[in-house]
């Protein structure tokens, strides 16, 4: 089976976005938003030329081919994050005991979940904002991984353990991920 001598992925840089590559660190900036990420793997080189980010690998193995595609996705998500941002929508569901959800500082507090006396908490990652309005929770930010992790933290905080989830359906559930309805 013939092997490719060179793998080259190119990513267009929009006009209002600035991409800087310093060693292994890729920095993407647009306006006030900036994301940095260390991308280092032996044999893979990242550079900018003619308004494009170029990821190259000569005589790649399977793992290096996969890593090139992964880095392309990471950089594309960074560019999308600083230009448009990412938004997850969660919905609050309860049958009998109304939950009170609020976001303060870097935590989301959930009171009266299934009539419990204690407060459940979920961590908000850096650079992520959480807005609670009625029975909807909106998680938004520039870093896709941090926004997704914050939404998952909120969803996991209302996980019912030791009960049949077909009956006890109270909780906070993700209904939209970065524009995709679930």
Swiss-Prot record:
Query: What job does the chain carry out?
Result: This protein binds to the 23S rRNA, and is important in its secondary structure. It is located near the subunit interface in the base of the L7/L12 stalk, and near the tRNA binding site of the peptidyltransferase center.
Q: Which NCBIfam families match?
A: PRK05518.1, uL6_arch
Biological process GO terms, please? cytoplasmic translation
Show the HAMAP family listed in the entry. Ribosomal_uL6_A
The name this protein goes by in its record: Large ribosomal subunit protein uL6
Known Pfam families for this protein?
Ribosomal_L6
Q: Which is a Gene Ontology cellular component entry for this protein? A: cytosolic large ribosomal subunit
GO MF annotation terms: rRNA binding; structural constituent of ribosome
**Which key words tag this protein in UniProt?**
Ribonucleoprotein, Ribosomal protein, RNA-binding, rRNA-binding
How does the record describe its quaternary structure?
Answer: Part of the 50S ribosomal subunit.
Regarding protein family, the annotation reads: Belongs to the universal ribosomal protein uL6 family.
What is the superkingdom listed in this entry's lineage?
Archaea
- Source species of the chain: Methanococcus maripaludis (strain C5 / ATCC BAA-1333)
Looking up PROSITE patterns in the UniProt record yields: RIBOSOMAL_L6_2
């Amino acid at each position: 089976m013939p092997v490719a001598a060179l793998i080259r992925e190119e990513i267009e840089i929009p006009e209002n976005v600035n991409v800087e590559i310093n060693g292994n660190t890729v920095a993407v900036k647009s306006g006030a938003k900036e994301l940095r990420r260390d991308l280092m793997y032996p044999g893979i080189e990242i550079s900018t030329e003619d308004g494009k980010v170029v990821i190259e690998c000569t005589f790649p193995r399977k793992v290096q081919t996969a890593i090139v595609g992964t880095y392309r996705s990471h950089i594309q998500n960074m560019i999308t994050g600083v230009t448009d941002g990412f938004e997850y929508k969660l919905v609050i569901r309860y049958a009998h005991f109304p939950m009170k959800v609020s976001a303060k500082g870097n935590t989301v507090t959930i009171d009266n979940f299934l009539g419990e006396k204690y407060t459940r908490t979920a961590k908000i990652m850096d650079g992520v904002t959480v807005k609670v309005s009625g029975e909807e929770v909106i998680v938004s930010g520039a870093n896709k991984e941090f926004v997704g992790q914050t939404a998952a933290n909120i969803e996991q905080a209302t996980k019912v353990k030791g009960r049949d989830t077909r009956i006890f359906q109270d909780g906070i559930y993700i209904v939209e991920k970065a524009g995709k309805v679930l």
